[in-house]
Amino acid sequence: MTNLVPVGRALLSVSDKSGLLDLARALADLEVELISTGGTAAALRAAGLKVRDVAEVTGFPEMMDGRVKTLHPMVHGGLLALRDDDEHLVAMAAHGIEPIDLLVVNLYPFEAAVARGASYDDCIENIDIGGPAMIRAAAKNHRFVNVVTDTADYKALLDELRAHDGATRLSFRQKLALTAYARTAAYDTAVSTWMAGALKAEAPRRRSFAGTLAQTMRYGENPHQKAAFYTDGSARPGVATAKQWQGKELSYNNINDTDAAFELVAEFDPAEGPACVIVKHANPCGVARGATLAEAYARAFDCDRVSAFGGIIALNQPLDAATAEKITEIFTEVVIAPGADEEARAIFAAKKNLRLLTTEALPDPLAPGLAFKQVAGGFLVQDRDAGHVDALDLKVVTKRAPSDAELADLLFAWTVAKHVKSNAIVYVKDGATVGVGAGQMSRVDSTRIAARKSQDMAQALGLAQPLTQGSVVASDAFFPFADGLLAAAEAGATAIIQPGGSMRDDEVIAAADEAGLAMVFTGQRHFRH
């Protein structure tokens, strides 16, 4: 295949004009002829650069508000012609087609239009047609043509040209082509995803996902696995949009756990008071509210001090100095919060390995979105679990109704259970978790494990009775038998919240009545795998 190919003519047509003038001046210094369109040509001329309008090349004016300008054989012939094919060369000569050796294009800002909530018609107008067509043509003919679709590649292009006397190597053009095809694929994905949402298409015939490389990692979940982090361009506050103030680069597991922690803490409205979540291996090991953020952290920490070591902490309010002081008493991997004051950041600065992330906002837990999981031969797609219940949604199914205090704790426990791996059992007392059972194959085992861990914690704290005494319990799915409920009662629970829907609901309700428990059904399940 052809290796070194000189660049004598370039077509520049960009929406994002950052770095454009420096690139164009450098190309002009290398004696590259510049061709351009519309606003790009105007910007180049305003900078004193010599440029030909694409209309001069095609002999056809731009029309229909710029919808038709580069969709012409004089452009696509110049991009697609094989320079070592005699028939192609004859055709070029016969029709006066000039070769285009370099294409610099970035596309209409469709993703930005969607992100700002533009109207349907405005989004349609921001779908680029000519740009992707040229990009694909140039990328296909990368044996002879360079295609640049990212401003981040301008420097590499100029370095390549200067290193090879105005020419580029095949390996360089191949890398550019790969980037170009990935860009058009991502662009089409953005359009199809937006349109599926706009038209409320629940299961489009074809579904694709795209991302932009944000970080390559040392490894994935385990050292033998390669990994990278890609962002999807959405504005949802979280680890992908956060500012990292200090600490080592985030690992694969850090990102996964931090996301889990922040999505849970966002369920607790900061206007209703401070809340803290501590996560280990994507499961919460402590969640609490408090009169202050420091108190919320301390109460969450007391749920499971052993598991909290080396964990991830998420806060629903900006980090303050008092909370920062408490957090630094043990080893913590990551702290994420909407903000952090200067004094808190100064305290953390002494802990060089502690990663601090701020997001300026919390994600909306009720916002629609998609979740997907890869399986062999395909992937599963579903709505994000934005399910929510309040007191009016609950059905009291036992003789005794929960007290106001129990009801508040039941709703708190239900919120936490939504974010615990199934089978999930969560004990809560006075707005704080006191036991979490996660990921067990049987519900009764999760119930017993959570109670046992709570008893161990009570002993470590020097308490006279288990933390679960007088608590309430949430179960992410129904109790198939009464055994799990009875285990919770034995641990000291006084009220239960669960979806209901078991064939043995009557048996479970009867057991609750006999034990003097209050129980409510939500009618909604929160499996999490």
Swiss-Prot record:
Pathway stated in the Swiss-Prot or TrEMBL entry: Purine metabolism; IMP biosynthesis via de novo pathway; 5-formamido-1-(5-phospho-D-ribosyl)imidazole-4-carboxamide from 5-amino-1-(5-phospho-D-ribosyl)imidazole-4-carboxamide (10-formyl THF route): step 1/1; Purine metabolism; IMP biosynthesis via de novo pathway; IMP from 5-formamido-1-(5-phospho-D-ribosyl)imidazole-4-carboxamide: step 1/1
Q: Which reaction does it catalyse?
A: (6R)-10-formyltetrahydrofolate + 5-amino-1-(5-phospho-beta-D-ribosyl)imidazole-4-carboxamide = 5-formamido-1-(5-phospho-D-ribosyl)imidazole-4-carboxamide + (6S)-5,6,7,8-tetrahydrofolate; IMP + H2O = 5-formamido-1-(5-phospho-D-ribosyl)imidazole-4-carboxamide
Check the UniProt entry and state the signal peptide residues, or none.
Answer: none
Instruction: Identify the InterPro entries for this entry.
Output: AICAR_Tfase_dup_dom_sf, Cytidine_deaminase-like, MGS-like_dom, MGS-like_dom_sf, PurH-like
Q: Which GO terms describe its molecular function?
A: IMP cyclohydrolase activity; phosphoribosylaminoimidazolecarboxamide formyltransferase activity
UniProt keywords (A-Z) are: Hydrolase, Multifunctional enzyme, Purine biosynthesis, Transferase
Q: Give the GO cellular component terms, alphabetically.
A: cytosol
E.C. numbers: 2.1.2.3, 3.5.4.10
Tell me, what's a Pfam family for it? MGS
List the residue ranges forming a coiled coil, or say none. Answer: none
Domain MGS-like span(s) in chain numbering? 2-149
GO process annotations (BP): 'de novo' IMP biosynthetic process
For the keyword Lipid metabolism, the answer is no
Q: Tell me the PANTHER family matching this sequence.
A: BIFUNCTIONAL PURINE BIOSYNTHESIS PROTEIN ATIC, BIFUNCTIONAL PURINE BIOSYNTHESIS PROTEIN PURH
Comment, domains: The IMP cyclohydrolase activity resides in the N-terminal region.
Q: Write out the similarity annotation.
A: Belongs to the PurH family.
- What is the protein name stated in its UniProt record? Bifunctional purine biosynthesis protein PurH
Q: What gene, per UniProt, encodes this protein? A: purH
